[in-house]
């Protein structure tokens, strides 16, 4: 789409056509696009692309912030496991402190970077000091990974976070937890490999697959 508003217009026209009641707005390590979609809806009364009836219906659609994480370890296909965190929209204001500011990426040598915008910028610049903030942010997003233990710790220690998130894991054999199953070929006599334990631990923190 030429602009984000044009994208939103196409998105909601299709949602109206398909009678969709809820939409998850996905971002890696942020809810920036979710906020943009909410802003579009806030200003939809001035849009000439929708009828009054369509505007009423669009405002009734549940918009959900969906943060996608890349989880270690790497799968058999060389990909990180993709995990989606779908949040209660009412929890939005708490995400910066309780989620993005709570998970860290360890780069070794005592260097840690938070999963918030500044942390991602700092990570990007640590990899390429010539980058400006915007390009460093993109570099940081491309490089940041989350460990299963970090997400598990957050779920264990923060009941407010736990009560306001639904965690979904892909079951794909490329970037999902099922990709670990291919490693069984390396353990001919083993009934249960350590990678099976990893797969099960990822499933245990997930609410849906």
What is each model feature region?
Residues 1-126, 130:
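A metal-dependent hydrolase metal-coordination microenvironment
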Residues 1-9, 13, 19, 39-43, ...:
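Domain-core and long-helix interface of multi-subunit machines
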């Amino acid at each position: 789409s030429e602009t984000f508003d044009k994208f939103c217009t196409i998105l909601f026209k299709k949602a109206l056509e398909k009678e969709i009641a809820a939409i998850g707005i996905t971002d890696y390590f942020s809810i920036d696009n979710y906020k943009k979609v909410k802003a579009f809806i806030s200003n939809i009364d001035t849009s000439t692309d929708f009828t009054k009836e369509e505007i009423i219906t669009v405002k009734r659609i549940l918009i959900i912030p969906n943060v996608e994480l890349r989880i270690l370890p790497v799968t058999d296909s060389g990909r990180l496991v993709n995990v989606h965190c779908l949040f209660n929209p009412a929890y939005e204001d708490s995400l910066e402190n309780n989620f993005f500011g709570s998970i860290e990426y360890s780069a070794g040598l005592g260097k840690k970077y938070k999963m918030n915008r500044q942390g991602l910028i700092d990570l990007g610049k640590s990899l390429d000091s010539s980058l400006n903030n915007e390009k460093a942010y993109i570099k940081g997003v491309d490089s940041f990974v989350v460990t299963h233990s970090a997400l598990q710790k957050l779920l264990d220690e923060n009941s407010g976070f736990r009560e306001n998130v639904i965690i979904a894991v892909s079951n794909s054999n490329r970037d999902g937890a099922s990709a670990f199953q291919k490693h069984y070929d390396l353990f001919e006599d083993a009934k249960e490999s350590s990678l099976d334990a990893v797969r099960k631990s990822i499933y245990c923190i997930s609410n849906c697959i």
